[in-house]
């Protein structure tokens, strides 16, 4: 696991709303689950394929994990460890954003 950065997948509109408010509060799934779902760099493709297949207008946010005080790594139902954040985060924690273009087969170009 790389503890320096975690990655958040969200829609462009969710990210634009966060930039307007200077804070990211989470996606509808995050809000329902009570924490913000992240992936490490090796989990991004798996997360995209499992939850975002055929979904256009997505962005991938590279987030400085060292700035996230309430970040914990928890075991998922698959047995893998995933980073979860039990708070909002300031958009200044995002060090890079990537547009995730949708390919014809429904997967995303990273």
Regions found by a protein language model. Name each.
Residues 2-110:
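Conserved, structured core segments of small domains
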